[in-house]
């Protein structure tokens, strides 16, 4: 049994230091921008993999003569690979470091895209898709954690949310390119951001907090100074990280079993709860049914998807800009409320289809609901759960906890993906009313349990959560 963390004893000795200079490093340096760009190249790969299957379905099935079952396996095996990658991601990142883990992930993605490009039979498509999915699963943990660990507290939320923005861009760019080029060339293009990141990893620093965790103190100082700028005073931040890390060395490395000790209860409930509510709030249902809804509204699916992109990217960008100004909680509350309204409108549109006088207006109500949901989800619920996941767990259990939270997210994604058609056959309106109820529950969950992490160091956040008795 691991020892319980005493919040008072973990309070940093550096708290007595004059704090006037602690924010002096909260500036955007060239190294910080470059490092973030390299990291989120992996997020773009993530988005490209998600967006690949939709535009290539027709050409791919015709050229390789795939059955419906074979193409369904090709689409779903990505999630299976991602679940396995997510389960292993935390331990890998703790063992070899955040930077090396991104390189490890990219090797799987490159091999996967290459296998898809060279495929002449279904089995190689599935192998390639599985490999890319595995890389995605690793990325979904390591990228937001790495960005959270390298950025100053005043910039951390916005920079970490760029992960979600690049996923959106990856999906959108791949979907648009897939409308004009063949599936093999699209797979080759998918390798470009992989190569960009692989090259960039040679010039960016490792996470200073991981270096401190493994006792590489000299490299820790060098990495932190590079990220904050050569003229920045890093003494307060450096001392706080060192003090916190040294006190945690008295505790053994956290495992999955250790996560269920009382002192981690609140962090676990918040991290897992946000991911469950995110996935069961209907995001995949909206995504899967969007084209049909657009067609029922008299809008072509291509124009409809472009409309979603037009809403999604600006709203995600707005979330990035507001993250460190308005805070995480207000954005989550607004976002969850908006997704609740969006799902309710879609559900209502299905209900009104049976009212003859209103059936024509119902399709436009569905279109409005989809766009309201998409914009609201992009503002907060899409990215903020990943930001909070990267902030609330202490370094000694971050690998195990992050893996658990990420696996929960992917399992939830698979459950909704698998059951959605069955739910729609059962009751289309009822399906979206259920999603609306989950989104409403998210508002209550955020209001009651989710802490505000804006403007606080990772160490301060973890002190404040403290010991929670179940």
Curated annotation (Swiss-Prot):
It is a multi-pass membrane protein. The chain crosses the membrane at residues 32-52, 68-88, 107-127, 130-150, 162-182, 185-205, 268-288, 303-323, 330-350, 369-389, 404-424, 430-450. It comes from the Eukaryota. Pfam families: Sugar_tr. Keywords: Membrane, Sugar transport, Transmembrane, Transmembrane helix, Transport. InterPro entries: MFS_dom, MFS_ERD6/Tret1-like, MFS_sugar_transport-like, MFS_trans_sf, MFS_Trehalose_Transporter, Sugar/inositol_transpt, Sugar_transporter_CS. Its main location: membrane. One of its GO terms (molecular function) is sugar transmembrane transporter activity. It is found in: Membrane. The keyword Hydrolase does not apply. GO terms for cellular component: membrane. Sugar transporter. Belongs to the major facilitator superfamily. Sugar transporter (TC 2.A.1.1) family. This is Sugar transporter ERD6-like 5.
């Amino acid at each position: 049994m691991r020892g319980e963390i005493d919040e008072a004893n973990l309070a940093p000795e550096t708290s007595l230091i004059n704090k006037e200079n602690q924010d002096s490093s909260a500036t955007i340096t060239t190294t910080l921008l470059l490092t973030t760009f390299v990291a989120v190249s992996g997020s773009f790969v993530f988005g490209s993999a998600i967006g690949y299957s939709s535009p290539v379905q027709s050409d791919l099935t015709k050229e390789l003569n795939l059955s419906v079952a074979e193409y369904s396996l090709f689409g779903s095996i990505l999630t299976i690979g991602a679940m396995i990658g997510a389960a292993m991601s935390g331990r890998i990142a703790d063992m070899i470091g955040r930077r090396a883990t991104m390189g490890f992930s990219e090797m799987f993605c490159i091999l996967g895209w290459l296998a898809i490009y060279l495929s002449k039979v279904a089995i190689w498509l599935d192998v390639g898709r599985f490999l890319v999915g595995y890389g995605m699963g690793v990325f979904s943990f390591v990228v937001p954690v790495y960005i959270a660990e390298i950025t100053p507290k005043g910039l951390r939320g916005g920079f970490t949310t760029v992960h979600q923005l690049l996923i959106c861009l990856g999906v959108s760019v791949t979907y648009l390119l897939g409308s004009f080029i063949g599936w093999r060339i699209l797979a080759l293009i998918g390798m470009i951001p992989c190569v960009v990141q692989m090259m960039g990893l040679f010039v960016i620093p490792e996470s200073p907090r991981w270096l401190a965790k493994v006792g590489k103190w000299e490299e820790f100082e060098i990495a932190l100074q590079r990220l904050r700028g050569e003229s920045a005073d890093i003494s307060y931040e450096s001392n706080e990280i060192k003090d916190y890390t040294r006190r945690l060395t008295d505790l053994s490395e956290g495992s999955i079993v250790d996560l269920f000790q009382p002192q981690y209860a609140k962090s676990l409930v918040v991290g897992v709860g946000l991911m469950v509510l995110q996935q069961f709030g209907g995001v995949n249902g909206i995504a899967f049914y969007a084209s049909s809804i657009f067609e029922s509204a008299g809008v072509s699916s291509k124009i409809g998807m472009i409309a979603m992109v037009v809403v999604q990217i600006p709203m995600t960008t707005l979330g990035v800009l507001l993250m460190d100004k308005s805070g995480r909680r207000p954005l989550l509350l607004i976002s969850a409320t908006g997704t609740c309204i969006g799902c309710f409108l879609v559900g209502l549109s299905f209900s009104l289809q049976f009212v003859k006088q209103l059936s024509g207006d119902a399709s436009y109500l569905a279109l409005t609901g989809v766009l309201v949901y998409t914009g609201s989800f992009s503002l907060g619920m899409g990215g903020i759960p990943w930001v909070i996941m990267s902030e609330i767990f202490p370094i000694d259990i971050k690998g195990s906890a992050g893996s658990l939270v990420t696996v929960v997210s992917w399992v939830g994604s698979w459950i909704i993906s698998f059951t959605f058609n069955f739910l729609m056959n059962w009751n289309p309106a009822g399906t979206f009313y259920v999603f609306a109820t989950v989104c409403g529950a998210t508002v209550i969950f955020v209001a009651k349990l989710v802490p505000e992490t804006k403007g606080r160091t990772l160490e301060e956040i973890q002190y404040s959560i403290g010991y929670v008795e179940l």
